[in-house]
């Protein structure tokens, strides 16, 4: 029994230590300033070299939240606003490769894109490896949605949070934990108290509210009746072919052909350049630490884990 207790305590200590290390490294990293820069070095921030103007390509990748290794909300919103006000910018082409993220940030991007369109400019969206949940939510702001034939999309639904009841485990290893609080539902989701039926109902109500918002976004932007959109909104992932058959996207094609279509149908084949924008974060101390300690590719894996584990719910997120 004593050995079992010691093992349990050791596990908790290890988990706590890893969480503290990742949290500290993440805190160091998020102080990096947001940058607006083209993908290719030879592309300078000179938007008047083509008198006819340019199409802006914005890459949206990684988990959608305030900021992480590959995503920065402030950068994205400010870039969209800047492009709206730039007379040389004629349209926006989104490259979306994300499993989604928080409801707040996903909706903020959607609204920023809708505001961009008030200038009379068009938006086309191209879905990469995955454009699910919040990624699809953002796609709905586009006038046309294209996808690669191997794209996974859809996952129209909401996660309001996860409850972990550790009271039995703590009791077995001899640890007592109590949170002093006022208000019977103030301590929801704390590991030291089980979730009550009333609390589950509260969270389900929040979840349902954001779900209806998502369904309405799909219905409005995909020219569907609400009932039709809801029938497609059970949280499942769709292949590109399934999404096309169900009216969730407009075409399965390449990025290059989407740009060609954009120029043909929106600008009568005008010779517009395509200027690329993506959030680029410097290789940081935590990246170096992870690569040295755990091997190549580990920094990306740890970032994905930390981004999702620190997610602020509710979320439009496909988790697989």
Model-derived regions: residue spans:
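Zinc-dependent metallopeptidase catalytic helix centered on the HExxH motif
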Residues: 141-160
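Flexible glycine/serine/alanine-rich "lid" or loop that lines and gates the nucleotide-sugar donor pocket
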Residues: 140-141, 245
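N-terminal organellar transit peptides
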Residues: 1-124, 128-131, 146-148, 161-320
């Amino acid at each position: 029994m004593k050995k079992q207790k010691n093992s349990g305590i050791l596990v908790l200590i290890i988990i706590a230590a890893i969480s503290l290390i990742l949290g500290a490294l993440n805190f160091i990293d998020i102080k990096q300033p947001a940058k607006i820069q083209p993908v290719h070095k030879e592309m300078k921030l000179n938007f008047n070299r083509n008198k006819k103007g340019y199409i802006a390509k914005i890459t949206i990748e990684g988990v959608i939240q305030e900021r992480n290794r590959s995503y920065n909300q402030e950068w994205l919103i400010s870039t969209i606003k800047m492009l709206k006000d730039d007379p040389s910018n004629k349209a926006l082409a989104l490259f979306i490769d994300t499993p989604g993220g928080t409801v707040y940030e996903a909706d903020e991007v959607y609204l920023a894109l809708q505001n961009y369109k008030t200038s009379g400019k068009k938006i086309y969206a191209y879905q990469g490896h995955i454009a699910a949940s919040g990624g699809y939510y953002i796609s709905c702001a586009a006038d046309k949605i294209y996808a690669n034939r191997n794209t996974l999309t859809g996952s129209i639904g909401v996660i309001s949070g996860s409850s972990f009841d550790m009271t039995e485990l703590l009791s077995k290893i001899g640890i007592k934990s109590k949170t002093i609080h006022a208000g019977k539902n103030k301590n929801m989701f704390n590991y030291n108290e089980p979730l009550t039926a009333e609390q589950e109902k509260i969270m389900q109500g929040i979840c349902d509210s954001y779900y209806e918002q998502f369904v309405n976004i799909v219905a409005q932007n995909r020219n569907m009746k609400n009932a039709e959109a809801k029938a497609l909104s059970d949280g499942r992932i769709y292949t590109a072919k399934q999404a096309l058959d169900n009216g969730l996207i407009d075409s399965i094609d390449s990025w290059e052909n989407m740009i060609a279509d954009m120029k043909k149908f929106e600008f009568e084949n005008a010779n517009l350049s395509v200027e690329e924008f993506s959030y680029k974060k410097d290789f940081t101390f935590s990246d170096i630490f992870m690569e040295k300690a755990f091997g190549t590719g580990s920094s990306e894996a740890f970032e994905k884990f930390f981004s999702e584990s620190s997610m602020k719910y509710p979320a439009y997120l496909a988790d697989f």
